[in-house]
A protein has these predicted regions:
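Active-site nucleotide/adenylate-binding loops and adjacent lid/helix of ATP-dependent enzymes
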Residues: 2-182
Length: 182
């Protein structure tokens, strides 16, 4: 199988990311894995989604660090691929990490994923569902039994009162964003 992985940027992927592990496992099982950065995708005039993608030549890796080094280095393959030729496209980018830096990249994986679906590519992590889950309100759609007691507000006095009610131990998250940013 040919599997594409849309990531924020190949240069910022690390050897501990799940995407790197999945791509390496695919290669070790005899599949082709292509990493595609958000800025590497194009929608061509002939209605095909294409991408500047990177893959590896070797077929067996013991460490994700070596896999990633070879993918990025001179031993790695860089080709402009037609996304329609992939068997599966996995959307693995993190739109929240692009906010304020590369705002154009926030929705690009989702948009290109939608275009690939229209061309018959199996897209894992449904682009429409990902778009719905762009902020923490999405979690409120889950059953009450599987989510923590939640307050969503910008009012600091309400946050302080909620913290007191919870015994002073709460987790504060931005509505949209990650890592305390948003």
């Amino acid at each position: 199988m040919k599997v594409g992985f849309v990531v924020n940027d190949i240069a910022t992927e690390t050897d501990v990311y799940t995407t790197t592990r999945i791509a390496m496992a695919a290669v070790n099982r005899g599949h082709e894995a292509w990493l595609i950065g958000a800025g590497d995708m194009a929608f061509d005039p002939d209605d095909h989604v294409r991408a500047r993608a990177r893959s590896v030549s070797k077929k067996n890796y013991k460490s994700t660090k070596t896999f990633l080094q070879e993918l990025r280095g001179p031993k790695g393959r860089s080709e402009r691929i037609t996304v329609d030729d992939l068997d599966v496209l996995m959307l693995r980018s993190d739109p929240a990490s692009e906010k304020g830096k590369r705002d154009w990249a926030q929705m690009s994986g989702i948009d290109f994923g939608r275009a690939a679906m229209r061309r018959g590519v199996i897209v894992v992590n449904d682009p429409d569902r990902l778009a719905q889950a762009m902020h923490k309100m999405y979690c409120q759609l889950f059953p009450e039994e599987v989510r923590p007691k939640t307050l969503i507000t910008r009012d600091t006095s309400e946050i302080k009162a909620f913290a007191r009610e919870q015994g002073g131990k709460i987790v504060i998250k931005p509505l949209q964003g990650s890592g305390g940013q948003g």
